[in-house]
Amino acid sequence: MTNIRKTHPLAKIINNSFIDLPTPSNISAWWNFGSLLGICLILQILTGLFLAMHYTSDTATAFSSVTHICRDVNYGWVIRYMHANGASMFFICLFLHVGRGLYYGSYTYSETWNIGIILLFTVMATAFMGYVLPWGQMSFWGATVITNLLSAIPYIGTSLVEWIWGGFSVDKATLTRFFAFHFILPFIILALAAIHLLFLHETGSNNPSGIPSDSDKIPFHPYYTIKDILGALFLALVLMMLVLFSPDLLGDPDNYTPANPLNTPPHIKPEWYFLFAYAILRSIPNKLGGVLALVLSILVLAIIPLLHTSKQRGMMFRPLSQCLFWLLVADLLTLTWIGGQPVEHPFITIGQLASILYFAILLIFMPVASIVENNLLKW
C-alpha cells in the first residue's frame, strides 16, 4: 500500500514542502529564519484576531478599547504585548533573513528574491498601519507625517494624501480604513509567502558554500524540522522574556497619551524597525528627494542581483566583501540610532554620512570589491 502522504493531493504538497523536501546537508542556523518568519506571521494573525474582537476603530473609543483589552479582557495584556513585541521579533527575523540572502548570494534566485522584496514592503506597510491603531500621540503624528510624505509626488501629491486620509487630516475615516487594511494585509502576506516558498522549491535552497548541492541532499524531516523547532523555542523564549519582563522596552512612551491633533510631540519617530529608513529620509533636505531615498533604501535590494560581479556566489571565501558586509551592518545600526535622535548637530551630519555610505557600499564598493577578488584569484 502506498503512503497516503505521498498520494493524497493535499498531503502531497505538504509532504514535498516540509517532509521529503531534499535539503542541502550543510545549511547553518542562518537558514532557520524562513520558518521563524512563518511562525511569527501565524502568531501575529492569531493574536491580531483576538485583539480585533475587542478593538473599536473609532477615534473616540480606539484608545480606551486598547486600555480595556489590557485591563478587563482575560489575558488581554498578554495578547496585546505578544502582538506588539511579536512585530519586533518579526522584523528582527526579517532583517536577519535578508542579511543572510545578501551574504550568501541567495539573491541569484531572482523570482524568490523579488517576491521577498514585495513581502518586505507589504510587512512594512502592515506594521505602519498597525502602529496607528492604538490612537496614541505617536500613532496619530506618525500617521500624519508618513502619509504626508506622499504630497511630495508632483501634481497628484496633495489629492492623493487627502484621498488616503478620507478628509483634510488624519481622522476617523483614516483610522477605520487603516484597521481594514491592517486586518486584510497579513492574509495577503500569507499568500505571498506561499508563492515565495513555491519559487524557492523550484530551485532548491542555497547553502553556505554557494556550490550546487544536488549531490549531497538530505530529507527535511527529521533533520531540519528538529532544527527549526529549536529555533522556534529560542524565538518563543526571547519573545516571552520581552512580553513578561519589559513589554514596553521597544515601544514609545508617547503612545500612552491619547492622540491630540493640537499638541505635537517633541520628537516624532516611528517604531525602531523603521528608524534606519527614517534616518535616510531625514538626511536629505529636499522633501521629494527624501521620499525617493526612503523608497530606494529598500528598493535597492532589487538592483543587487544585477550588480553581482563575483565569480563566487556567497561571501564565505571573499574576505574583502565580508568586511564591506559587516561595515554595512554597522552602518545600518548607526542609521537606526540616528533615526531615534533629534534633528540637530552632530546627528544631522552623522545621518547624512551614514546614508551616503549605505548606498555607496551596496552600489559601488561591493561590486568593485568583487572584481578585485576575482583578479586576486588569478594570482
From Swiss-Prot:
A ubiquinone binds at H201. GO terms for biological process: mitochondrial electron transport, ubiquinol to cytochrome c. InterPro entries: Cyt_b/b6_C, Cyt_b/b6_C_sf, Cyt_b/b6_N, Cytb/b6-like_sf, Cytochrome_b, Cytochrome_b_C_euk/bac, Cytochrome_b_N_euk/bac, Di-haem_cyt_TM. Its cofactor is heme b. It is a multi-pass membrane protein. One of its GO terms (molecular function) is ubiquinol-cytochrome-c reductase activity. The chain crosses the membrane at residues 33-53, 77-98, 113-133, 178-198, 226-246, 288-308, 320-340, 347-367. The keyword Heme applies. Heme b b562 binds at H83, H182. Belongs to the cytochrome b family. The cytochrome bc1 complex contains 11 subunits: 3 respiratory subunits (MT-CYB, CYC1 and UQCRFS1), 2 core proteins (UQCRC1 and UQCRC2) and 6 low-molecular weight proteins (UQCRH/QCR6, UQCRB/QCR7, UQCRQ/QCR8, UQCR10/QCR9, UQCR11/QCR10 and a cleavage product of UQCRFS1). This cytochrome bc1 complex then forms a dimer. This is Cytochrome b.
